Amino acid sequence: MIENRRGLTIFSHTMLILGIAVILFPLYVAFVAATLDDRAVFETPMTLLPGTQLLENIKTIWVNGVGVNSAPFWLMMLNSFIMAFSITVGKITVSMLSAFAIVWFRFPLRNLFFWMIFITLMLPVEVRIFPTVEVIANLKMLDSYAGLTLPLMASATATFLFRQFFMTLPDELVEAARIDGASPMRFFRDIVLPLSKTNLAALFVITFIYGWNQYLWPLLIITDVNLGTAVAGIKGMIATGEGTTQWNQVMAAMLLTLIPPVVIVLAMQRAFVRGLVDSEK
């Protein structure tokens, strides 16, 4: 008996199209708003046809920022990139070395240390964030790149993922390295790192987007407008009280913040997908 799957195929494709429409429609509305002038963006209902002011709106926020005493948006983008890249490199480095030590070094209470790291996943961010802010304040790292990045470089999730991957590597690799007289760090550099390329690519993409999209942490740590990040800076563009929000410029800023993560994903999509597939095996 041959099943007729035509109905299922039509249904699945219909749901896929609806899902894409739900995701893309708000982005399209934001794009249209970014192309309008100050008058057209406040018309009710707002037009869904693109205007001609996109480059002008981008130029305005890129050079002058939005709002009183606002930093140029290019500076916010630069701060966001420095933050995201630093968090990504730091988190991967710390997590890989931590997992490597837990898996291949024999020392007392190593499993206890691992579970102490892992148990932090059970704590909500809201529980940990204010004690972390107090520590950063006591260390005089407010309004600094160090305060923005260092607390976010530790990751129980990344450590756990690398530990699980390292545990799948055969013991024969370790024995062969020992016979060749390789030191632990040489074994890590020459064998473990090359075998971890796909996992590194997947984690790089995920961690970069995580760092780029940070909103609450920069708001708590940074008061200097010249150290503000793009995602948190958009919030400052929205007026409160009787002020008027320039929504066309806010939407233009939002579109600019999409560019770096999209570029990273497109540039590394093959390695990213391969890393996710390999991690499931």
From Swiss-Prot:
ABC transmembrane type-1 domain sequence ranges: 77-268
GO biological process: transmembrane transport
Any coiled-coil regions, as ranges: none
UniProt subcellular location: Cell inner membrane
The keyword Phosphoprotein appears for this protein: no
Membrane-related topology note: Multi-pass membrane protein
Alphabetized UniProt keyword annotations: Cell inner membrane, Cell membrane, Membrane, Transmembrane, Transmembrane helix, Transport
Biological role stated in the UniProt entry: Part of the ABC transporter complex UgpBAEC involved in sn-glycerol-3-phosphate (G3P) import. Probably responsible for the translocation of the substrate across the membrane.
Protein family per UniProt: Belongs to the binding-protein-dependent transport system permease family. UgpAE subfamily.
Full protein name: sn-glycerol-3-phosphate transport system permease protein UgpE
Organism encoding this protein: Salmonella typhimurium (strain LT2 / SGSC1412 / ATCC 700720)
Gene name tied to this protein: ugpE
